[in-house]
């Protein structure tokens, strides 16, 4: 069975204008999303808090984007051994009824931690998605992602 590989890096963006200029001048970079609004709500189980462990290695999130909803669980873990690498178990699915998910969370005593709203502009360069995120009440970030590669 083939395994899906996703490589992703995020970092604070100190000069978004410079990055935008380079992407716009590059004929191979195509604008694939502009000023898309994402609303992420993060949750944690009642019996433990995902924020207690630093760096945060586990999270549960719902996302609203263009009247579409999804739910994602991620858990980062370090492999054993001398040359250990980090791996992420990620489970994500689309959701038709976000209010039903919130009600399920309420019944299971899964509590809301924080809501993060951001505006994302994305470019596709070869097999790489380069996104500029403006996070409300924070700052700008760049996300570089290679995904849907199978080995």
Regions found by a protein language model. Give the residues of each.
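Residues forming anionic-ligand binding surfaces in small-molecule and nucleic-acid pockets
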Residues: 74-77, 137-143
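Short, flexible turn/loop "capping" segments at secondary-structure junctions
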Residues: 1-3, 135-138
